[in-house]
Amino acid sequence: MFTGIIEELGTVREAEEGRLIINAAKVLWGTNLGDSIAVNGVDLTCTYLEEDGFHASVMPETYRRTNLGELRPGDVVNLERAMTLAQRIGGHLVRGVIEHTGTLESFTPEGDAIIARYQAPPEILRYVVVKGPITIDGVSLTVIDKTSDSFAVSLVEFTQEHTNLTRKRPGDRVNLESDIIARYVGQLLEERPAGK
């Protein structure tokens, strides 16, 4: 589990079929082989540690569900270590299991903030609630608007500076994870027998 609060921006050193090598520093502190690190919101297992980075294996299913297959050397990625029971949850509970990708539609300045609008599939939008949480490329954000095919979030200055979200361009794909509580409640209600 993660919190959606990005600890560090890493840089892709190598992106090969089935493996990523990422330059990083902060997320290496206290990290051991086999530990989880979220890369753009995707829970990956650390398979090899170096002084200035780590290796992670990527399964074919992960490539199908996420934007990790589009990464190239030099790309900047959001990184977060798995949470511990002793830390604050500054964002919301994030599994690191990407359900679908969405597409950046637009950025609109609003004071010091930027309103980011994303196109998303119905499978995600059914669990998106205005004022509820959503995870975009691993970043915990609050939904401020929703339409039949998109939603919007506000990126404050800190988020603009400490994540890779404003480095994206319209048309770029992002990893989406809906709120785990909304998803579980929704699925339980869908599976409930009719009339009960």
Predicted regions and their residues:
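Conserved loop->alpha-helix
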Residues: 1-196
